[in-house]
From Swiss-Prot:
Any one Gene Ontology cellular component term annotated for this protein: membrane
Organism whose genome encodes this protein: Escherichia coli (strain K12)
Topological relation to the membrane, as annotated: Multi-pass membrane protein
SUPFAM superfamilies, per the entry: MetI-like
Family matches, as InterPro entries: MetI-like (IPR000515), MetI-like_sf (IPR035906), UgpAE/MalFG_permease (IPR050809)
Membrane-traversing stretches: 13-33, 78-98, 111-131, 136-156, 163-183, 215-235, 262-282
Keywords in alphabetical order: Cell inner membrane, Cell membrane, Membrane, Transmembrane, Transmembrane helix, Transport
Entry superkingdom: Bacteria
Record function comment: Probably part of the binding-protein-dependent transport system YcjNOP. Probably responsible for the translocation of the substrate across the membrane.
PROSITE patterns, A to Z: ABC_TM1 (PS50928)
Descriptive protein name: Inner membrane ABC transporter permease protein YcjO
Length: 293
């Protein structure tokens, strides 16, 4: 093999090796993206026998003039901010607790990540069962046992309580990702740094601010960036839990399949992509994802 490519550029051989991956990437990513952008400029009927109509930027104009879109965008921003902040803080707190030796540490760590590796549909079913107004454990405790309220609330049928629950569900569901990431970097910090800071009279908060925070900052930036992207694109968890919280993913789905407006739905997805791309660019200007500022 060395003789075969001796004295020649490795680029053709590298492209040959990359060709299957590039074809797969083009077929699964590039082509659907181009098709989606094309659809966003069309009025596309569900009946394949009816020809689509080019409408220019009409779908984008309808989005920007639709109060429902702005409401969904605002809900998505709040949802993303709360989930990212909550899951990151909780993941860091649990990681710091586990960054020490104690009995059954590995078993406890496995239990912590259980919510992250369990299929969403199973977790959604468990939550809807717990908050069921007829036989759920939450309403049993609140009504029958503690008498906190007279009548069992319809948790997932009220927009306010539904939003709180989907946020709590997402924090609990996704904090193990932050936990694993932070625990890995915490275990690389030299313990002597904490000992030296303690000898200098630093309290727990000062040790965290001076020693821990600078060490975990690259990982923190990566976790926040990735979780922000993933939560902005969220659909399945919220849609399975309730129909009362119209974040952008749910709003897009309803536009496409409830109202059969595929052109507008495609335009929404393009706008969503632009927002996410802008967030990535702004984040990369502040923090290099490789850990170099």
């Amino acid at each position: 093999m060395n003789r075969l490519f001796s004295g020649r550029s490795d680029m053709p051989f590298a492209l040959l090796l990359l060709a299957p991956s590039l074809l797969l990437l083009g077929g699964l990513v590039a082509w659907p993206m181009v098709s989606n952008i094309e659809i966003s400029f069309l009025r596309l009927p569900l009946n394949p026998n009816i020809e689509s109509t080019f409408v220019g930027v009409s779908n984008y104009v309808r989005i920007l003039s639709d109060p429902g879109f702005w409401h969904s965008l605002w809900m998505t921003v709040w949802y993303t901010a709360l989930v990212v902040a909550g899951s990151t803080v909780l993941g860091l707190a649990v990681a710091m607790f586990f960054n020490r030796e104690f009995r059954l540490r590995k078993t406890a760590r496995s239990l912590v990540i259980l919510s992250y590796v369990t299929p969403s549909i199973s977790l959604v079913f468990a939550w809807k069962y717990m908050f069921n107004n007829g036989y759920g454990i939450v309403n049993y405790l609140g009504v029958d046992l503690l008498h906190l309220y007279e009548q069992a609330p319809l948790w997932f049928d009220n927009p306010g309580s539904s939003f709180v629950l989907v946020v709590l569900f997402a924090i609990w569901r996704y904090f193990p990702y932050a936990f694993i990431s932070f625990l890995a970097i915490l275990q690389t910090i030299d313990k002597s740094l904490y000992e030296a800071a303690e000898m200098d009279g630093a309290n727990a908060w000062q040790r965290f601010r001076i020693v821990t925070l600078p060490a975990i900052m690259p990982v923190l930036a990566t976790v926040v960036t990735l979780r922000t992207i993933w939560m902005f694109y969220m659909f399945a968890d919220v849609y399975l839990l309730t129909t009362k919280v119209d974040i952008l993913g749910v709003y897009l789905y309803k536009t496409a399949f409830a109202f059969n407006d595929l052109g507008k739905a495609a335009a929404i997805s393009v706008v969503l992509f632009i927002i996410i791309f802008a967030v990535i660019l702004l984040t990369r200007k502040r923090v290099n994802l490789n850990g170099n500022k």
